[in-house]
């Protein structure tokens, strides 16, 4: 008999599935796993200071590398601390496998110390959850977990292993290393004949259209079809609108790029969608922040929806044609059916909206030197320029700065813009940034966070320092929960209820962690400070104290249509 433990089997299964890095925090019910991990040096473990940080780090690692991220936690509070991170990954289609310890099998259901039914808790925010009842099931469960996490629309999968199963011995010779295949967990694809018929119909609609628009989401990045998208747009002279999570699917410098649509999208993106006679949604969810009021979205357009996930079709928006298939294969079939086109009349109309675009995006005139108190958008524009210059990965937290960065970012490679889009989880950026940097050690990574979101996960600075991760961290400090304050200004008569916040002296905080830190509060400090920060070898912290009551525009209010944008000139006076 060649005996091994369940914990050792779990470590070997992770290696076999291609895992290289684990983000986690140990505890009692997961101790056998951590003991086995000691004998598996090929599995790098990153000790996060909070389990939510571990989940976000696994998410950032997965987005930056295209590989499945792995996070680890103990039972009870350790496992429940993962939930926000798993929900963020679930909403944005990020492949993550979460490994949790559970109390020993006899204690399940008895309210044992640190017992939580974590499989039950995470049902709404995972693709599937496994409670491993037998040690011999471990190899198959991990095989299936990784397959499910990465297949179809990616997402998180949970593997919960009781402590006694981790410690149990099993004869290796009796094990099957192949994964169990549960047919009920796999969505049956459309037949080739159905897909071909759908593609023919899409081609007909596109070739007859006078005012088509491509609405692009994260599915383009996940399917690796940015090249096909660019070819389609160039060949058929198509305007391209990119969602928050699809910004890096199409070059911002391409003349056909109209930017981000939706609540804080560009005028030309929103007006183009509203005036279109055909909207082709490629790997996009048509969520409320993108389309505005559903019954008034693109009122004269036929809607085509390409998505690998059948449950995404008509979840929020009608679809005249739905193509449920891998986007790469769908576009491969569509491209030969689409001839070259000249859409000059449509483009002339779009150029009129271009001329009305936000004047604050105009570059400064030659010789211009910015002076005076620092503006938030001005600060973020400078950071965005540094990100583009170095082909860096941009990781944004949630709030006003998230929208400004999305508006200002230049060209980015697919997988280079990371943010919590669907869930909007504050505290995401710092741990996701460290995960991205570990996954892409040869690329610079910039974290952009507000003072509110930064304080939700700043304990991960200790992880950054311990692991020697050269993050560039820019904190936009306006002394408010900025996006909430903006809504209070517009809709609640400037009654700023519990949105003004204080924070630590970040120079002192950086010193406490041994991180070089700069404080900026004037425009003339920007360029020199960012240049210094960019060349530091280790992590750096840039504290940007900006004007307090700056707002993000344009803005489409909740319940409004995309062409009912409020611009800076139309803001309600205080």
Features from the language model and the residues they span:
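Thiamine diphosphate
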Residues: 99, 108-114, 263, 270, ...
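Active-site diphosphate/adenylate-binding microenvironment
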Residues: 7-10, 15-17, 25-28, 33-37, ...
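Active-site nucleophile and cofactor-binding loops and adjacent substrate-binding regions
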Residues: 25-27, 46-56, 71-78, 133-134, ...
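Conserved short loop/turn motifs at secondary-structure junctions
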Residues: 217-221, 368, 450
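N-terminal alpha/beta PP-like core and its mobile active-site loop of ThDP/TPP-dependent enzymes
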Residues: 1-347, 363, 382, 470-475, ...
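Generic enzyme active-site microenvironment
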Residues: 158, 305, 395, 448-449
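Phosphate/pyrophosphate-binding active-site segments
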Residues: 1, 136, 204, 300-398, ...
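Short, internal active-site loops enriched in acidic
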Residues: 163-166, 400-401, 548-549
């Amino acid at each position: 008999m060649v005996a091994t433990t369940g914990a050792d089997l779990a470590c070997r299964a992770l290696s076999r599935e291609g895992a290289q890095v684990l983000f986690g925090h140990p505890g009692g019910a997961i101790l056998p796993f951590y003991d086995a991990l000691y004998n598996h040096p090929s599995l790098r473990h990153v000790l996060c200071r909070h389990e939510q940080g571990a989940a976000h780090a696994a998410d950032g690692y997965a987005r930056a590398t295209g590989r499945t991220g792995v996070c680890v936690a103990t039972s009870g509070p350790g496992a429940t601390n993962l939930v926000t991170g798993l929900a963020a990954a679930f909403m944005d289609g990020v492949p993550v496998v979460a490994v949790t310890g559970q109390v020993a099998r006899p204690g399940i259901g008895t309210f044992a110390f640190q017992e939580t039914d974590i499989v039950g808790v995470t049902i709404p925010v995972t693709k599937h959850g496994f409670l491993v009842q037998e040690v011999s099931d471990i190899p198959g469960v991990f095989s299936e977990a990784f397959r499910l996490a990465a297949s179809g629309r990616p997402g998180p999968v949970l593997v919960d292993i009781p402590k006694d199963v981790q410690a149990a011995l099993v004869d290796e010779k009796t094990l099957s290393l192949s994964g169990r295949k549960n047919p009920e967990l796999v969505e049956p694809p459309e037949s080739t004949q159905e897909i071909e018929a759908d593609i023919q119909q899409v081609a007909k609609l596109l070739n007859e259209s006078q005012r088509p628009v491509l609405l692009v989401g994260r599915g383009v990045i996940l399917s690796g079809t940015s090249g096909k998208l660019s070819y389609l747009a160039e060949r058929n002279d198509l305007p391209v609108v990119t969602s928050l999570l699809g910004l890096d699917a199409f070059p911002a410098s391409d003349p056909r790029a109209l930017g981000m649509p939706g609540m804080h999208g560009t005028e030309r993106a929103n007006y183009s969608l509203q005036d279109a006679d055909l909207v082709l949604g490629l790997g996009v969810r048509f969520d409320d922040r993108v389309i505005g009021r559903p019954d008034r979205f693109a009122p004269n357009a036929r809607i085509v929806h390409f998505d690998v996930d059948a449950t995404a079709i008509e979840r929020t928006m009608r679809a005249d044609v739905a193509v449920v298939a891998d986007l790469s294969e769908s576009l491969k079939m569509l491209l030969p059916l689409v001839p070259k086109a000249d859409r000059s009349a449509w483009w002339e109309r779009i150029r009129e909206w271009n001329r009305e675009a936000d004047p604050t995006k105009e570059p400064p005139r030659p010789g211009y030197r910015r002076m005076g108190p620092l503006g938030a958008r001005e600060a973020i524009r400078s950071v965005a320029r540094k990100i583009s210059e170095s082909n860096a990965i941009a990781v944004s937290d949630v709030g006003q700065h998230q929208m400004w960065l999305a508006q200002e970012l230049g060209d980015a490679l697919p997988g280079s813009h990371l943010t919590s889009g669907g869930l909007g989880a504050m505290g995401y950026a710092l741990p996701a940034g460290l995960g991205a940097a570990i996954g892409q050690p040869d690329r610079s990574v910039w974290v952009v966070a507000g003072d509110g979101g930064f304080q939700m996960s700043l304990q991960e600075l200790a992880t950054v320092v311990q692991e020697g991760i050269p993050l560039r961290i820019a904190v936009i400090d306006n002394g408010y929960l900025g996006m909430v304050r903006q809504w209070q200004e517009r809709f609640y008569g400037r009654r700023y209820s519990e949105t003004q916040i204080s924070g630590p002296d970040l120079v002192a905080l950086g010193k406490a962690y041994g991180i070089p830190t700069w404080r900026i509060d004037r425009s003339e400090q920007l360029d020199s400070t960012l240049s210094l920060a960019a060349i530091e070898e280790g992590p750096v912290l840039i504290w940007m104290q900006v004007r307090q009551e700056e707002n993000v525009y344009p803005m489409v209010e909740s319940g409004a249509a995309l062409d009912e944008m409020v611009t800076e000139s139309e803001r309600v006076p205080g």
